[in-house]
Amino acid sequence: MPVSSIVSEVERDFEVLGRVRNIQAQHIIACKSLVHRINHLLRNIPGGESAFDEVAARYDACVLSVVRRVCSSPLLPDTARRIAHLPTGMGGLGLRSWKSTADAAFVAAYANAAKVLPTLLPSCAYFAKRLPTTQTIHGALSSAVPGGSSTSPAPSRLAFFASRALARLNSRAPGVHEVLRSRDNRTPNHLQHRITELIDYEDLLLVKGEIEAQDTEEYPWRSALFNSNCGDPYTFNTVPKDKTTTIADNRDFAVMYSRRLLLPINPMSEERVCPACLVTSDKRVRESNCFVLDPYGNHCVHCPKASSGARTSAWHDPVVRVLGDILKMAGLKVKFEEANVLVIGPPGLRADLVASMPGGSKQIIIDVRTADPCTAENVKRSAQIPGHAACQAEILKKKKWGHFVNAQGDLFVGFAVEAGGALGDGAKSLLDLAACANGSSTAEIAAFTTYALQRIHITTQLGVARTIRANFPILGFYITRVQSIWGMLLPGPASASHLPRTFSTELYHNSSNNKHMQHKPRQQQPEPRQQLFLLPSPALTTQLLALNRAVQRLLCSR
């Protein structure tokens, strides 16, 4: 079958995939199934040659169609496309491009054929002549003049294309020859995987360079968030199996996608106001030219008013609940929200979790901390050191709990998780302890660790997305209307004098009954909290719900 026909079938599959309602299912099917359809094709053709550029462009457009649908963006920046093609362990989405796989797949298949065919068919001596080993090809490439062709012609077309593919790989990742020369590569799959790892690492360095070029020196939030995203290889690579791993709301998954690709979640073309802290869009970050309110959701995550609101209910509490369930599965006894756990220390301190091994005398006191690498205090170090925000959060927790817990003979663990998904050292140690308590063999420990990390990371990403949606800035016009509503609800001529002449007030002033009512004694107005119930209930949209919360905050503050 021609290559173009196979790619046309892949295009039809991606077109059908777009009809799936759940966009998490779209991503998983594309990442786990459709992307791998061309893997065996690329092992049999020199896909890195210029003759396949048109087919490669068609295939990459199909793969990126999933990203465009999820992010509702017909045009993607070059950095976002590069991030989407990276593996999930390097901060990407795992949607592999044609060029990132073609040369590695062809060289791996050729190296296996050149090694196995002469051994399996010793009577066919021409195989050894027409299929020289990759070491022979590398020696010919090394003896060639820089910028020129090899001194000896290739004995076959396959050897010719293999030498060109190997030259392209060496130009991108010089360690490819050492991988080919090693003796532990038993299958083409394993060899292709190891070569692709080298290429991905070089692509990762290029992506980091592009991100650093877009950042500012005072507030490098892109690098900080990308480093945190690199600590989460599970969220966009996990097949939904249960309630914890299934994301039913497409809007939450779209926010997670945009954060992963460093794309704006909602444009900030007009004046906006944070519904939680009421900061306006013209305020700037200290010691920086960047604005506090941003279209990427950073302020929504670390807003000071959100730490005790949506950030706790949508992010912190679900992580505590999932972590408790994981520890219970490992056989530990778990208590939630345990107060007065300290024998020596300030009374009233409440731990998120208190776990104990069966038959053990020591308790494990766990306090979960959510950290954001994009805050003004952490952003510069987080852009240089992955996991810095989680490390600082653990230090703060240890200062608060550590010496008191150690004095009473128990063990304290500060479970810190960043907004991008990176975990602190204490969190990793706790999950390793639970995995060892659950199973004895290496396979059981690895399976439990994967199970636990999948649920922790997905819960974190979903909690961050819901926090952003709950605190996303609303239009400044809505705040003006809120102030007008507040003025209507308060008694007295001082508040009424500042009201704008809306349609309802004009009807009131122009009505015939107004002349008879203005001579009557003024009736006592009820409290503003009572009149809140007379307002029409807002529609179930994000901005109107945020407007309703802003109304209640304004009424309570006055």
Protein language model features and the residues they cover:
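Post-transcriptional modification and biogenesis factors for structured RNAs
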Residues: 511
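Cationic, low-complexity basic patches in intrinsically disordered or flexible, solvent-exposed regions
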Residues: 507, 516-532, 544, 553
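Low-complexity intrinsically disordered segments
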Residues: 499-502, 514, 538-539
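Compositionally biased intrinsically disordered regions enriched in polar/charged residues
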Residues: 538-539, 546-549
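Nucleic-acid-interacting cores, centered on viral/eukaryotic replication and modification enzymes
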Residues: 1-508, 547
